[in-house]
Design a protein with these regions (language model features):
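Terminal, low-structured helical/coil segments at or just beyond the last alpha-helical repeat
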Residues: 32, 189, 193, 197-207, ...
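Alpha-helical segment of the N-proximal tetratricopeptide repeat
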Residues: 39-70, 87, 208-220, 350-360, ...
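Helix-start (N-cap) detector for alpha-helical repeat units in TPR-like alpha-solenoids
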Residues: 41, 75-76, 109-110, 143-144, ...
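Structural signature of tandem alpha-helical TPR/SEL1-like repeats
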Residues: 54-66, 87-100, 121-134, 155-168, ...
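Structural marker of alpha-solenoid helical repeat scaffolds
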Residues: 70, 104, 138, 172, ...
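Canonical tetratricopeptide repeat
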Residues: 80, 114, 148, 182, ...
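TPR/TPR-like (Sel1-like) alpha-helical repeat modules
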Residues: 170-171, 181-189, 200-203, 285, ...
Length: 670
């Protein structure tokens, strides 16, 4: 949780005068001080501030202390003295002075703010929150205080509160790239919580497999996505939408014939499946079968023209959304030849196809024009319907998701069933109304809040909201260090270390003091066993944040690789202090102590790490420790456990590899 911890501190320091603006009358003093004393206070205070501006912190410290000898209850001076200590990285002394300032004047915004910042740096988010909220009582329009409050909430793992805080800060600075980046990641963490909850609640369930499949699909790992969609279908053969989603994955992988078979399957179950009609029409267009493509799109337009356009990427759907992905270059060139035929066809579907071709060719103005022709040609006089539950149900059954948006607030009440709420949330999500979808889920009855179905849809909402935040970041500044950082994160998640390293280096070139960047780069370099380069970056991260658990752990591991446990140990001890619940650090500490011959300490750490052992490696290390201690029975038990886990792990891997190979080679598509 250290990824925002030193950011903007220097800027905050420069703004200190706005937070304090002290008078030269100590708190609690009701009568003016004698003129001589007052003059001395003014003189020392002015000298201290000048020294502080000149970065002569030793002189500033002496002058502030001289003021406090004359006026020990001068709260602002205690605070400024604390700041001088802070600028010299004397955090303990700084915090003492901030507390003294607050004891005299509890509402002092600057002292509350900086004390909150210091608790963030110590990893004590809950303590920081109280001080930062106090600072906001008097300085509610300061985005940097809101940013630090969000940081404290992140450290405390209160991601819901962090999201609320970041939205409040974005009201003050709507295009702030730091706030938008953090908002996207806060939503990502909430999504991961839901994924973990679903895995625990319903492991191997259809929804759990579907969520895994969608995750692999978004990372362009199509064979793994196919396997998990197939698993989901085995668990729930009749679940709506699964064949359509599987078809989309196959279509993006260029397996057009297989994709069409999946769309056909979905349409046999539901002839009005909008997604299947749109994608089957797209697949047939890719096959240059215009006569088969246009009827599907004509039918889709008749159901919901706005949603049809959204699925084809003609309406902005989100940063990295699959609907916005271009087809392969060869496919784009091939289908562009269909333009002449389509121009001779006067139908809404033909205009939609022309819009799709233009969008794929990067001609967005022409795409918009053709899309408007398609929409106007399809628009009919629809009798106005009242916003009743029956009418909303009818629209949901017909897949007319765009029609329900104006009715949602009227239809959703405390008496609305959980089933209808979830269906409305699903439709809102499909229509790009992510906040509306989440709100519908948040108001589910208590008994349904933790269901697998609710957890699945919340995870989907958080994923889309994260995407929307990152899209806003892209629009705010497409060349910013935050966007390079985001692209590095995405490439790292996809396993493309080379591209990720390029992006992180680009971000560092623009903002070398940004927390977590050096770690992200160093971690990938360490993963690629580029040890000297990795150490440079990891040490740079520790200059910014000496308590960064990831940087400390990786540095320790670089020395374990070189069999230098005496150098690894200090880093690993510090890493554990910063992240005591991490089993990997426990394992690495056990390894260090084992290599140093301190087997009892090694045993202690390995025993904490074994519950997270999935391949038998930790049990094996523990067995070796017992062997060294002469405890034969314990060693035999751990060796047996290690062998069993290792065999099971290898078996799973072989089966997974076999299935991936089968999926990859089974397609007959060119």
């Amino acid at each position: 949780m250290a990824n925002t911890i030193h950011f903007r501190f220097r800027i905050s320091v420069l703004l200190l005068v706005l937070l304090t603006a002290p008078t030269l009358t100590p708190a609690g003093q009701t009568a003016p001080a004698p003129a001589t004393k007052h003059s001395a206070i003014e003189s020392h205070f002015a000298a201290a501030q000048q020294a502080q501006r000149d970065k002569d912190y030793g002189t500033a410290e002496r002058e502030y202390q001289a003021v406090l000898v004359l006026a020990p209850d001068f709260a602002e001076v205690h605070m400024n003295l604390g700041l001088v200590y802070q600028l010299q990285d004397r955090f303990s002394e700084a915090m003492t002075e901030f507390r003294r300032a607050l004891k005299i004047k509890s509402g002092l915004a600057g002292a509350n703010f900086f004390l909150g910042v210091d608790y963030c740096k110590l990893g004590e988010g809950m303590k920081a929150i109280a001080y930062l909220k106090a600072a906001l009582q008097t300085e509610s329009n300061r985005p940097d205080i809101w940013l630090w409050l969000a940081t404290a909430q992140e450290i405390a793992a209160d991601f819901q509160a962090e999201v609320v805080t970041l939205h409040r800060a974005l009201q003050l600075q709507p295009e702030d790239i730091d706030l938008l980046y953090l908002l996207g990641h806060a939503y990502e963490r909430l999504g991961k919580q839901e994924v973990a909850h679903l895995e625990k609640l319903a492991p191997g369930s259809s929804r759990n497999e579907q969520l895994l499949a969608e995750s692999y699909a978004s990372s362009n790992e199509w064979p793994s996505a196919v396997i998990h969609f197939q698993n989901a279908l085995v668990a729930s053969p009749n679940r709506a939408g699964l064949h359509a989603e599987l078809g989309e994955v196959l279509l993006r992988a260029g397996k057009v014939n297989q994709a069409i078979r999946e769309f056909d399957q979905e349409l046999r179950r539901d002839p009005g499946s909008l997604r299947s009609l749109v994608r089957r029409g797209e697949a047939r267009l890719i096959q240059e079968n215009v006569d088969a493509s246009l009827p599907d799109w004509e039918k889709a337009i008749g159901i919901d023209v706005e949603q049809t356009e959204r699925l084809l990427g003609l309406r902005e759907a989100g940063f990295g959304d699959s609907a916005l992905e271009q087809l392969p270059e060869a496919t784009r060139e091939k289908i562009q030849k269909l333009g002449g035929d389509l121009q001779n066809r006067d139908s809404s579907a033909a205009h939609l196809a022309l819009a799709f071709l233009a969008e794929q060719n990067g001609n967005f103005s022409q795409a918009a024009t053709e899309a408007s022709f398609a929409a106007s040609g399809a628009r009919k006089e629809v009798p106005s319907r009242s916003c009743t539950e029956a009418n909303v149900n009818l629209a949901l059954e017909r897949g007319q998701f765009s029609e329900i948006a104006p009715c949602i607030e009227k239809v959703l009440t405390s008496r609305t069933s959980a089933e209808l709420r979830i269906r409305i949330a699903s439709a809102s999500l499909e229509s790009g109304e992510y906040e509306t979808a989440l709100k519908a889920l948040e108001e589910l009855p208590a008994a349904d809040q933790n269901s697998a179905e609710a957890s699945y849809w919340r995870a989907r909402c958080y994923e889309k909201l994260a995407t929307a935040a990152f899209l806003r970041l892209y629009h705010a500044d497409p060349n910013s260090y935050r966007l390079h950082q985001l692209m590095g994160d995405l490439e790292a998640a996809r396993g493309d270390d080379g591209k990720a390293i390029e992006e992180y280096r680009a971000a560092i070139a623009l903002r070398p003091s940004l927390p977590n960047l050096h770690y992200s780069l160093g971690h990938l370099l360490w993963k690629d066993l580029k040890v000297p380069e990795a150490r440079v970056e990891l040490e740079a991260e520790l200059v910014l944040n000496p308590r960064h658990p990831g940087a400390l752990n990786d540095l320790g591991d670089t020395y374990l690789l070189e069999h230098q446990p005496h150098l690894a140990l200090p880093y690993l001890v510090r890493a554990l202090a910063a992240d005591s619940g991490n089993p990997e650090i426990q394992r690495d500490l056990g390894t260090a102590y084992s290599e140093l011959g301190d087997y009892r300490k090694a045993e202690e750490h390995f025993k904490i790490a074994v519950p997270a052992d999935h391949d038998g490696s930790v049990h094996y290390k523990l067995a070796r420790v017992y062997q060294a201690l002469g405890e034969k029975e314990n060693a035999a038990r751990e060796f047996a456990l290690s062998t069993a886990l290792n065999r099971e792990s290898h078996s799973k891997l072989e089966k997974q590899t076999e299935r991936l190979g089968a999926v990859t080679t089974s397609a007959e598509d060119p």
